[in-house]
UniProtKB/Swiss-Prot annotation:
ATP binds at G53, Q54, S55, G56, S57, G58, K59, S60. Homodimer. Part of the tripartite efflux system MacAB-TolC, which is composed of an inner membrane transporter, MacB, a periplasmic membrane fusion protein, MacA, and an outer membrane component, TolC. The complex forms a large protein conduit and can translocate molecules across both the inner and outer membranes. Interacts with MacA. This is Macrolide export ATP-binding/permease protein MacB. SMART domains: AAA. Coiled coil: none annotated. One of its GO terms (molecular function) is ATP binding. The gene is macB. The keyword Cell membrane applies. It is a multi-pass membrane protein. It is found in: Cell inner membrane. CDD domains: ABC_MJ0796_LolCDE_FtsE. InterPro entries: AAA+_ATPase (IPR003593), ABC3_permease_C (IPR003838), ABC_transporter-like_ATP-bd (IPR003439), ABC_transporter-like_CS (IPR017871), MacB-like_ATP-bd (IPR017911), MacB_PCD (IPR025857), Macrolide_Exporter_MacB (IPR050250), P-loop_NTPase (IPR027417). Belongs to the ABC transporter superfamily. Macrolide exporter (TC 3.A.1.122) family. Its main location: membrane.
Amino acid sequence: MSSQDLYANAATDKPLMQVKGLIREFKAGEQTIRVLHDINLTIHQGEMVAIIGQSGSGKSTLMNILGCLDQATAGDYQVFGQSVNRLAPDELAKLRREHFGFIFQRYHLLGDISARDNVSVPAVYAGMDGQARNERAEQLLSDLGLADKVNNRPSQLSGGQQQRVSIARALMNGGDIILADEPTGALDSKSGKDVVQILKNLNAQGHTIIMVTHDPGLAAQAERVIEIKDGYIIADYKNEDYQRPVAQFSSIIDKHRKSAFGSFIDRLLESFKMSLLAMRAHKMRTLLTMLGIIIGIASVVSVVGLGKGSQEQILSNISSLGTNTITITDGYPYGDPRRQYNDDNLTPQDAQAVADQPYVLSVSPQLNSNMSVRYRNVQEAASISGVGKDYLDVSGETLAMGQGFDEQSILRRTQDIIIDSNAHKTFFPTTANPIGEVLLIGSVPGRVIGVLEPNEGGFSRSVDSPTLYMPYTTMMSRLIGSAYIESFVALIDNNISSSAAESAISNLMKSRHGTDDFRIRNSDSIRQTIESTTAAMTLLISSIAIISLIVGGIGVMNIMLVSVTERTNEIGVRMAVGARQSDIMQQFLIEAVLVCILGGLLGIGMAFAIGELINRVGGDSFKVIYSSTSIIAAFVCSTLIGVVFGFLPARNAAKLDPVEALSRD
């Protein structure tokens, strides 16, 4: 209901507030205690009413019901002609926000924010524009003699000054109806008189004032006095000398209301600010709460980085076997009975046919044998491999010195050889550069034209015995006298699916041979096995690390439950000034999420530090490689943990009863 509707009601002398047959009962174990008995009451716009009674008489309970902080057990209570008995919590909050202002005996100011911000809180929930909100808060404080205290916190103010801040807060959204609970109870006599005069001035401006007190002197200042005893109204009379003022003011909220989205953003920022203040107030507790999240996120990111680094290192070693290669080997598949009758099926022409395919980059035929090799007085058994001119490309081997084979080496069947590091150490232990030296392979001489780099990888082709390489044509004609090759290796274009290339080569070979008298091995299957194995190990270890995240999340929930308990009074104050349940839930949910996000960021930072340390210690042999996906996932995960584990505490806070919350210190 707008302020215009309010004043229309007043003009027609309709009751502003009307109570009929109101009863309020409380459960106390097995018993039911009735605090208010059949209360009937009518209050009109512009009245200044004092409800007087001793402690336990039910006056504060009645005020809580009138202020929509509590609801009656039975009977009817109407505000502006509308029954509030069946209103939802957020609808009651709307009434409090737009029409009620509360002045409490114990002030109930938020200790972590300034006087101006305390006064502004109701307007945040009402959706008032930020600049207008601050200007009005400062104006109200100035009107109440606190112009020089706008930036002071409650702890820096006297009791009288704090009560004035409380009054300014009650007026922030217009304060059509001011409910004051023992407004002078905690003040000295001078401050008490000042507060009474302020209330009378507000009544003169048209505000409806309802005071709850046990002081007859304060009650005598009101236009109307209602005496209550043991839950019954025993007297209701007017002070004859009191002059009732005429309402002459306009709405404050409607002039400066923001859009629904703008109001939501304001409330979000308010929640964010209060979350930061709460975290700052308990730095050590917040850090310890974050610790589980920090360790969990750091563990997950580090483990994924270690897994990625291990995978890359293994794949780098696999490259010594030839990257994306397919090996075609002579002979029927194992288990085929034809295998024992025919093993000579592959020819150099088969290798050339495969090399001519558009998806094949290069091919190297291969034969293998073991022979005695001699150099001067050194004789040793060695592995001899006949290879093609593209062997270095398909195998991934590199030369330490010298050169490889070329087209002429194959065509002319040259007696050139390339030796590996084992052969270098075996036959030329004191010769740094053996290029040009001649070895005797069986009875065939071979001139050294190249030396291979040592391959220390776990997937190296090298064996412990010396290995010599020569053109496959030379080996076929001069050493073994055969027209067949044992195998050939094809290097596949990286842009082509390795499995598709394997299928195409298999079909080509079957069409040439008319049968599958060959075997195919795809090096990509090794890589896939390694990748799947390291991924499985990473997932396993990550799942263990995630347990730390869950423990951290439980820690966040535990601390947030403690925070809700500690800040129950603050929750009650916010509800009293009009905060919706969603506003309260949002505030504590943001705090939980903020703790987890900060913990996540610190965890990611710790993971980078751990990775840098490992990279420095491991050198080139081992690296931690971070994945942007894992970092983003870790950040999202920490946020979700805040939402999931912060929901229960936030929900508990939102479901608190305003009266019960205000009663706690």
